């Protein structure tokens, strides 16, 4: 029954988006004049909300513009507006970040290498290495990865479904007894390895890391909290690399004003999404995201089979 409701809800979203897109902005994104402020605000909202909950921002930023009839805004724009989410993560977790940073610095000065703050900083650092390493491998050995089959619509749908099933298993077998203070360096490495899965569009960075956290017995809110902290270096690096690309090559089919608008929109909606998720996971499970991911993936596959959605 829950899956049926999620399926119907997702279908209604797709239908509504298509109608809104056709009525408000009928032209696809093909040149610098056609990515309007309205479109940038919507795409920033999509980025902000879906980056911070375990449903994959990359998938939604590819699928939703297509459903709206706008076309794919491109990988560079998608990565750059993620910087808006970074601002919100820093804003929301400012106390955690300052405590960890200054605590780690004090520990190094006093040679207290068993300090929880130093261990947390090392955990985040070591946990970031896997996704950077594999990301560089992809850049070297699959230079056209952004246009590969792994970024196709059908691949995104399948990844969404598979990740939902992994989250089901994590919910079933995870003990959920360990809080934030019980995190150690090994946890950072394990969750960092789980984060590598996010290189596959449709998996979701927060989805893979929260799932990894649940597998090793973390509380849901603890898994989400560490997921956001761990994501800061990786998302920032990806956003800055693509920002440099846009600055070097020009903003082309996006435009500077639209990009800045998208970033600002992402800041606002990311903060709202983070605040909601952290409160939600204090008392609730992740089944709402499981049902949504299943419905999202299946609906995309149905759309492809029926010809409503193009497998690009």
From Swiss-Prot:
Coiled coil: none annotated. The chain crosses the membrane at residues 74-94, 122-142, 154-174, 183-203, 226-246, 254-274, 288-308. Pfam families: BacA. GO terms for cellular component: plasma membrane. It catalyses: di-trans,octa-cis-undecaprenyl diphosphate + H2O = di-trans,octa-cis-undecaprenyl phosphate + phosphate + H(+). InterPro entries: UppP (IPR003824). One of its GO terms (molecular function) is undecaprenyl-diphosphatase activity. Its EC number is 3.6.1.27. It is found in: Cell inner membrane. It is a multi-pass membrane protein. GO terms for biological process: cell wall organization; peptidoglycan biosynthetic process; regulation of cell shape; response to antibiotic. It comes from the Bacteria. The keyword Flavoprotein does not apply. Keywords: Antibiotic resistance, Cell inner membrane, Cell membrane, Cell shape, Cell wall biogenesis/degradation, Hydrolase, Membrane, Peptidoglycan synthesis, Transmembrane, Transmembrane helix. Catalyzes the dephosphorylation of undecaprenyl diphosphate (UPP). Confers resistance to bacitracin. Bacitracin is thought to be involved in the inhibition of peptidoglycan synthesis by sequestering undecaprenyl diphosphate, thereby reducing the pool of lipid carrier available. Belongs to the UppP family. This is Undecaprenyl-diphosphatase. It comes from Trichodesmium erythraeum (strain IMS101). The lineage of its organism: Bacteria, Bacillati, Cyanobacteriota, Cyanophyceae, Oscillatoriophycideae. The gene is uppP.
